[in-house]
Amino acid sequence: MRYLELDENVKVSQIGIGCMRISGMTGKEAETLVRTALDAGINFFDHADIYGGGKSEEIFGNLLASAPGLRDQMFIQSKCAIHDGLYDFSGEHIRKSVDGILARLKTDHIDSLLLHRPDPLMEPEEVGEVFEELARSGKVRYFGVSNMNRYQMELLSSGVKRKLWADQLQMSLAHTPLIDAGINVNTRFDGGLMRDAGTLEFCRLNGIAVQTWSPLQKGFFGGVFLGDDEYPELNSEVSFSEIESPSLLVRRGSLSLLRGRKRNLVRIQQARNPSRRIRWWRSASQGTVILVS
């Protein structure tokens, strides 16, 4: 397993477990998922306050409460800013959200807080103030964003003193807008249209980790591409029983940059069958990047 070093004693696995679907699991199923991940060297668990209406965090928190010492083995991340159909970066909402997250997870701190979706009416200085407050109180260690482009991050950073450590973005073999424009520079192809202001390049230039969510998904919440009839060539190469060449998923030209050189990329994987998917991605991670969902 490869890890990102955020500080001298803080390492984040380059495969992460997305916890959205934990809301549909029993406590025992969630425990199996978590312990299987930890046994594979995965210490990164990604939550959001809206996952299952908070139930995902509650189930996870019950597990932490029942197993003293388990929390110390983890890097736990959660996200906030979505509520009642709005994206809300107000200080009041962020404070309230973090307190709710901590209560549901039954912990006194989270390692990372991401702002889930960009608030067009954000007040950067207000966000900066609440970030400092949360850091001083020990409730949050690191801060980042999710689904933001370059200029949104620059705007936010104008009022935030702390470095944004991560941007969580959708990316998979079947969803590649993040890198299409870079590959199709100076062409007439639709893929050459710059839709995100060069967000990937901006993150790399500024040491911001890219967390890719739903790396097995097609389109926007279109289900996974594994076993899907729309991708016969790809699926003909994938064996779930024995992976002889884990790099096969990154052989396509559009994803060649994901080979093991890029240590500041993180992938987040949603897992319903933990033993199969974690075993497969553990093998694949030797030549690729982090998974987070």
Indicate residue ranges for each PLM-predicted region.
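Short amphipathic alpha-helices and their capping/turn segments at secondary-structure boundaries
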Residues: 1-8, 58-68, 97-103, 153-158, ...
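N-terminal binding-site loop/beta-alpha segment at the start of enzyme catalytic domains
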Residues: 1-74, 136, 218
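Structural preference for beta-strand elements that scaffold enzyme active sites
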Residues: 5, 12-16, 43-44, 73-79, ...
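Active-site mouth loops of central-metabolism enzymes
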Residues: 18-28, 80-92, 116, 121
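Short, acidic/polar
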Residues: 25-38, 89-105, 151-155
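Residues at alpha-helix caps and immediate loop-helix transition turns in enzyme cores, especially N-
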Residues: 29-30, 56-59, 90, 123-127, ...
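Active-site groove signature of glycoside hydrolases
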Residues: 102-123
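Beta/alpha (TIM)-barrel catalytic core signal, keyed to glycine-rich beta->alpha loops juxtaposed to Asp/Glu
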Residues: 118, 122-293
